[in-house]
């Protein structure tokens, strides 16, 4: 006798179909590349797909200056990485709020140094032009241009791989999370680093629904139940909200996470957490105030692709098709940092 309610049955059937589809996809994939964006940006290579990132606007008008990498010693206290795709309408107010906050913190403490890296993910509007003009007024802002639209995951990955900060915050360009929530994540990560320098703090909306602090639509709440089941299948445990675009990494954690990240679009967050938990990093959730922005980029088709990606993460890591590089194979030992 089936005691499950109709909705639970529907979710179970969808998950089962996705599992079969992804398994067949993995089975039929004769070659699954273990290369990541890191292999095309940091490692020396003659591959024609090699990507070179230069700071924009250039600090030197006569030459292009390459972005530093996360494997160099930190130069500032914190880096805010902002992935941006067609954000011409929202990037200015977001930068206004963020710069005001960071300047206030810096005025209170001279050791609070910062940078913002806006990663333009192949925008078709004038996002890059807006950020460039903003950066002329605020030299702590750097524009990193992707050669084409590669996905939010790739944008975050590129920004974090080229950060100078001791702490690296991933933050969405839509302003859904108030920027001063950074302080809550900052406090938590400092407590975690007394145990392990490799640490992540995840901004979370899941803890706040009872307190009505998170204003989420019923549709997203329903879809969240199904995704939570898939996230568990993918191998993420103990994290209730993997998808909030507000996460803080130590530099030491970033050096392991982003060279090993394969997923380049919406579903990269769970993969980072799978990598972190395989490395036994310290991972914690902190409630943040969050408001859903009406002009959401996530469409139904994107949600389906994300669900397939989650099952793909589970299969590829378990089958050894994707791996977390051992220390001897990573740039950490090569750079001797």
UniProtKB/Swiss-Prot annotation:
Keywords: Endoplasmic reticulum, Glycosyltransferase, Membrane, Signal-anchor, Transferase, Transmembrane, Transmembrane helix
GO annotation, biological process: protein N-linked glycosylation
Enzyme Commission number, as recorded: 2.4.1.117
Positions in the Lumenal compartment: 1-6
Record pathway: Protein modification; protein glycosylation
Transmembrane as UniProt keyword: yes
Residue ranges of the TM segments: 7-27
Subcellular location: Endoplasmic reticulum membrane
Catalytic activity of the protein: a di-trans,poly-cis-dolichyl phosphate + UDP-alpha-D-glucose = a di-trans,poly-cis-dolichyl beta-D-glucosyl phosphate + UDP
GO molecular function terms noted in the UniProt entry: dolichyl-phosphate beta-glucosyltransferase activity
Xref: InterPro entries: DPG_synthase, Glyco_trans_2-like, Nucleotide-diphossugar_trans
Biological role: Dolichyl-phosphate beta-glucosyltransferase involved in the glycosylation of glycoproteins through the synthesis of dolichyl beta-D-glucosyl phosphate which serves as a sugar donor for transfer of three glucose residues to the Man-9-GlcNAc-2-PP-dolichol precursor to N-glycans.
Family: Belongs to the glycosyltransferase 2 family.
Name under which the protein is recorded: Dolichyl-phosphate beta-glucosyltransferase ALG5C
The species this protein was found in: Trichomonas vaginalis (strain ATCC PRA-98 / G3)
Gene of this entry: ALG5C
